[in-house]
Curated annotation (Swiss-Prot):
Name of this protein: Probable dual-specificity RNA methyltransferase RlmN
Binding annotation for S-adenosyl-L-methionine: 188-189, 222, 245-247, 325
Matching PANTHER family: 23S RRNA METHYLTRANSFERASE (PTHR30544), RADICAL SAM CORE DOMAIN-CONTAINING PROTEIN (PTHR30544:SF5)
Role played: Specifically methylates position 2 of adenine 2503 in 23S rRNA and position 2 of adenine 37 in tRNAs.
Enzyme class label: transferase
Active site: 113 (proton acceptor), 368 (s-methylcysteine intermediate)
EC number: 2.1.1.192
SUPFAM superfamilies associated with the record: Radical SAM enzymes
Gene name linked to the record: rlmN
GO biological process: rRNA base methylation; tRNA methylation
Co-factor(s): [4Fe-4S] cluster
Comment on bound cofactor: Binds 1 [4Fe-4S] cluster. The cluster is coordinated with 3 cysteines and an exchangeable S-adenosyl-L-methionine.
Bridged cysteine pairs (disulfide): 126-368
Compartments, record wording: Cytoplasm
Length: 376
């Protein structure tokens, strides 16, 4: 890899100071906090439960449909607990309408994207957790855009609720349905926005009507390897799936592809992933974007297998190979299919379960690593 191909962006862990915060929303709050907040606004506490039912269970966004609320108070209640957070600017479709990428403008003008993917047996929502990203991975369009700000818990949840509405209303081919899976693999490094992401996970998994009532097993949180946060997440008691974006099994290459590796080595990062599996009893997914001539050599497959096998073969890990998706100006390309097959063969020879990701939304820049949130 030449010097011109390497990232020159710094790692950024904290959002810029002084940014105005999004409006406070029901989804930012735990159930007991909602009741207290309603009372702060001079409203009866039980109204918070009614609004939670409309938002999370009925997926209502029209105050006129909230007929159990006094007509004279609806506007006040909605403005106080369900303020508008995001405006859809554009929705693009692929895969005969079953993949939908939405560009959102947040209250302060920041742009983010989410992707809804419907399959015959499930519907997955890929959500953003930050506007931009500070992890500076050179092959990722989001990382090359830098970090604008963290998203709030409610802004994250609203992406899922909006997708759930689209499915419930039959707007996606296949008839009415529901969101079964959520992956934090959109824009941003989820564990760099830890508090808001954890709050969103709790809202997604809280039983209805306090939340969406999803199974924690249907939620995947990705990370490039913020080791202290990986350890913290393991102790939260929420058995979500952890996906580690590894992309290289050796420090020399990973330092270039995933700059956080200069802070936390491959050994430290994989050990934290193993610890997550040990504590939660949930299998960890190792994400590995296949780049032609960069990280797809057979010897690297062997090394990856050895690194993972070093922590035992008790089913703690699974490798998910991702054909590299093109991004504007990128000098990297996807691996040759023959090299990809050999990579899989070598990992499986070391008893590492391995799959190649079904790439959805590539033609609408909605696939892994392509989200850049531009209005162009």
């Amino acid at each position: 890899m030449s010097d011109s191909e390497r990232t020159s962006l710094p790692l950024v862990f904290d959002e810029p100071r002084g940014r105005k915060k999004p409006p406070r929303h029901l989804a930012d709050l735990a159930p007991d906090e909602r009741t207290a907040y309603a009372k702060e606004l001079g409203l009866p506490g039980f109204r918070a439960k009614q609004l939670s039912t409309h938002y999370f269970s009925r997926l209502v966004d029209d105050p006129d449909q909230m007929t159990d609320l006094p007509a004279g108070q609806r506007a006040e209640l909605v403005a106080g607990l369900l303020p508008g957070l995001m405006t859809p600017l554009r929705t693009m479709e692929a895969d005969r309408g079953t993949t939908r990428k939405t560009l959102w403008r947040l209250f302060d003008g920041a742009l983010v994207e989410s992707v809804l993917m419907r399959y015959p047996d499930r519907a997955t929502m890929c959500v953003s957790s930050q506007a931009g990203c500070g992890m500076a991975c050179p092959f990722c369009a989001t990382g090359q855009g830098g970090l604008q700000r963290n998203m709030s818990t409610a802004e994250i949840v609203e992406q899922v609720v909006a997708g759930a509405r689209s499915l419930a209303r039959g707007e996606v081919p296949g008839g009415p349905g529901r969101v079964s899976n959520v992956v934090f693999m959109g824009m941003g490094e989820p564990l760099a926005n830890y508090k808001a992401v954890l709050g969103a996970v709790r809202r997604l998994t809280d039983p209805a009507p306090d939340g969406l009532g999803m199974s924690a097993r249907g939620v995947t949180v990705s990370t490039v390897g913020l080791v202290p946060r990986m350890r913290q997440l393991a102790d939260e008691g929420i058995p979500v799936t952890l996906a580690l974006s590894l992309h290289a099994p050796d420090d020399e290459l990973r330092n270039e592809l995933v700059p956080i590796n200069t802070r936390f080595s491959v050994a430290e990062t994989v050990e934290a992933a193993w610890n997550y599996a040990k504590v939660t009893k949930r299998r960890v997914s190792i994400e590995y974007a296949m780049m032609r001539g960069i990280n797809d050599q057979a010897w690297r497959a062997d090394l990856l297998g050895d690194v993972l096998r070093g922590y035992g073969d008790w089913g703690w890990v699974h490798v998910n190979l991702i054909p590299l998706n093109p991004t504007p100006g990128s000098k990297w390309t996807a691996s040759d299919p023959a090299d990809e097959r050999e990579f899989v063969r070598r990992l499986e020879a070391k008893a590492i379960p391995t799959t190649v990701r079904d790439t959805r939304g590539r033609e609408i820049d909605g696939a892994c690593g392509q989200l850049a949130a531009t209005e162009a």
